[in-house]
Amino acid sequence: MSVVLPALDEEATVGGVVAAVRPLLGTLVDEIVVVDSGSTDATAARAREAGARVVRRDAVLPDVPVRPGKGEVLWRSLAATSGDLVVFLDSDLVDLGPDFVVNLLGPLLTVDGVALVKGFYHRPLRLPSSGMADTDAALTGGGRVTELTARPALAALRPELAGVVQPLGGEYAATRELLESLPFAAGYGVEIGLLLDTHTTRGLDAIAQVDLGVRKHRHRSLRALGATAAEVLDAVLRRCVPGHPGADPLTQFVPVDGDWLPDEQAVATADRPPLATQRATGS
């Protein structure tokens, strides 16, 4: 069984995540792999010190040109690992224990037909400007992109998945057989893309959820979340609306000297093919 942590400039937290999982090495877990997507800080060193194997994103499938985004890192991680089961954990988690991994694996090991297990949790997000909790996240169970983009999109276009508490959560487990059979959406659309594609190809009974208790993580700016929401929405539309052409760059506006100036951000939209297809065709 493989535990995968995608990481980009997470030197403050990645070592703690690896250390939390390390007690399971040699028993339930065969390998802990941190896939570094170009960190400029000490992420790789901290991960190695904590006991993980670190691979660079561009060192995996080196003949395939690298694209930006989280989905790219997770897709390449399949080629860098070997476990029949794969657990994905975000690298910015704080105060987690090995029970995260144990609980995510439970349904895969005990329930016939389950191929994807999504974690859900309470999110006591601290707002850095005030030190106060994000009460919206506490009351709804999801973050801002989940509540304002993902959940309404699923309700409108795939209501069978409306019961998924954390459709965008970065803590989940799946069989390698499933993961290598599915395309990986680019960027932050990867989690909802895998959820939708699992439902399409395997049905609702292939998806399980587990309560992981509390998830503490870093805060991201509203502007950054706008680009995340665009990638999530594009992944949904590509899978639920035939003929959807893909997203254009996202135009946001920033205040400069009393004026509002447009600022375009690229939206990662191109799916990677199933890894099984990539291996078979080499393209």
Report each predicted region and the residues it spans.
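N-proximal low-complexity "stem/linker" segments adjacent to membrane-targeting elements
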Residues: 1-20
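Cell-envelope/extracellular polymer assembly enzymes that use nucleotide-activated donors
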Residues: 1-2, 31, 193, 198
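Short, acidic, metal-binding catalytic loop of nucleotide-sugar glycosyltransferases
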Residues: 19-29
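A conserved acidic beta->alpha catalytic loop
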Residues: 36-45
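Acceptor/aglycone-binding surface of glycosyltransferases and processive sugar-polymer synthases
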Residues: 62-70, 96-176
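Short aromatic/hydrophobic "clamp" motif used to bind/position activated sugar donors
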Residues: 86
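Conserved catalytic loops of nucleotide-sugar-dependent glycosyltransferases that act on lipid-linked
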Residues: 136-235
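Terminal low-complexity segments of carbohydrate-biosynthetic enzymes
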Residues: 220-283
